[in-house]
């Protein structure tokens, strides 16, 4: 659709920062959403308003406007360049569907188009976007057109560490349940605080899932929030095992260690998952089960070589025993393992 002169004027106006005494102009031009001005970031191509502080790209903003049956914004965003076909994933009334048709939308979307829109919409990892994706795709009949395996592959790829090493996600779950867990996991992985609180308040039966995601994705901030403030608990050794699933998870491993988890068990789990940095970090914290873990490293020559050497000792510069996530993040941000350095400088000849 070619933009009219009026829509171009609105786009320019939305890119400016007007004083409050000129807000009436924005209301007159329908540049008003969630009782506040609509702004358009021309560099990032993002629509922002009070209810969507993180911003939404044009196509996603259109999806939201269609879901809300906001006819003025549907027309505006389409004139600004949004693909009206994206609106078909969230249309919920015949009147809005008719408007989409008038603006050039297809009668229906095929499997490839639905999957592409799903992938595009989930690209931006912001609270506003993830919550919207959950609302749009939850129990969405359009997803019945998409091959179930293709949808599950899209979900499983970003959560592959959890898929491989826990039984908390599997093919027995309905697609709707998998999507809910997926959106929640993405919120935790990227520490999207508003989205985390949205899911936490609405889906209390997934509290353990939240804690698991925080441990696996090394989000020590939400781990602390969930454990200390929201009182979400798991077996401590299981918490440590989940923290060891993914390599470089120093912050969540250390958090569990301070709580009292067994560091030798953490070393064992790290070796089982072939996570070398985690393994060296456990050595720094005092893990010393080298001979006991040799059979576990069977078939992985590098780990067997590391464990066979008698050159390791706990770090002489102990870390502060504190569960404050700010302190943990600060101390471990640029952490270099003493025992890893010892191994790398050792002459293996």
Curated annotation (Swiss-Prot):
The keyword Zinc-finger does not apply. Pfam families: ASFV_360. It comes from the Viruses. GO terms for biological process: taxis. ANK repeats lie at residues 57-89. Keywords: ANK repeat. Plays a role in virus cell tropism, and may be required for efficient virus replication in macrophages. Belongs to the asfivirus MGF 360 family. This is Protein MGF 360-12L.
